């Protein structure tokens, strides 16, 4: 499930996020073509939902840092937003577009499959972000 995330005190904070406000806002987007996350971008494009993309980043890790000091908003997985809200003084609201539920997969090279440190990291990621 995806939400919209932005800094506390943003002009959208405390209001229901409408589709019109979503379209008018400046967006930061994690470029994720060919992944589950990329499907969200493709879905919105097919539905005719245009965004004012002001910045693209190669991964979600940068988004919290960017949002806390700008007026941009981002479409992010709800589980990711939950981890970013307090550390970056952000808020998350329901997404104005009815997005489909999308499965996100974790991949690794076969040669690392039995490596203890890789197993530990995969387990940590699974425990933190899976719906179990």
Please report, for each region that a protein language model flagged, where it lies by residue.
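Short beta-strand-to-loop elements that line the ligand-binding cleft
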Residues: 29-31, 50-59
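Short beta-strand-centered segments that line the small-molecule binding cleft or hinge
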Residues: 1-6, 13-16, 42, 91-93
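Beta-alpha-beta core module
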Residues: 1, 61-110
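A short structural motif in glycosyltransferase catalytic domains
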Residues: 6, 31, 57, 75-76
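Secondary-structure junction motif
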Residues: 12-19, 25-47, 78, 114-118, ...
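Bilobed periplasmic-binding protein/Venus flytrap-like ligand-binding cleft at the lobe interface
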Residues: 106, 117-131
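A bilobed periplasmic-binding-protein/Venus flytrap-type ligand-binding module shared by bacterial periplasmic
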Residues: 5-10, 104-114
């Amino acid at each position: 499930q995806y939400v919209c995330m932005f800094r506390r005190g943003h002009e959208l904070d405390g209001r229901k996020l409408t589709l019109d406000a979503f379209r008018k806002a400046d967006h930061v987007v994690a470029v994720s073509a060919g992944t589950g996350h990329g499907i969200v971008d493709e879905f919105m494009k097919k539905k005719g939902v245009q965004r004012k993309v002001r910045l693209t980043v190669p991964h979600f890790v940068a988004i919290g840092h960017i949002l806390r000091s700008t007026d941009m908003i981002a479409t992010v997985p709800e589980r990711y937003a939950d981890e970013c809200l307090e550390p970056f003084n952000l808020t998350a609201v329901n997404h104005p577009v009815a997005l489909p539920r999308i499965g996100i997969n974790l991949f690794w090279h076969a040669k690392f499959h039995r490596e203890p440190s890789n197993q530990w990291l995969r387990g940590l990621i699974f425990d933190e972000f899976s719906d179990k």
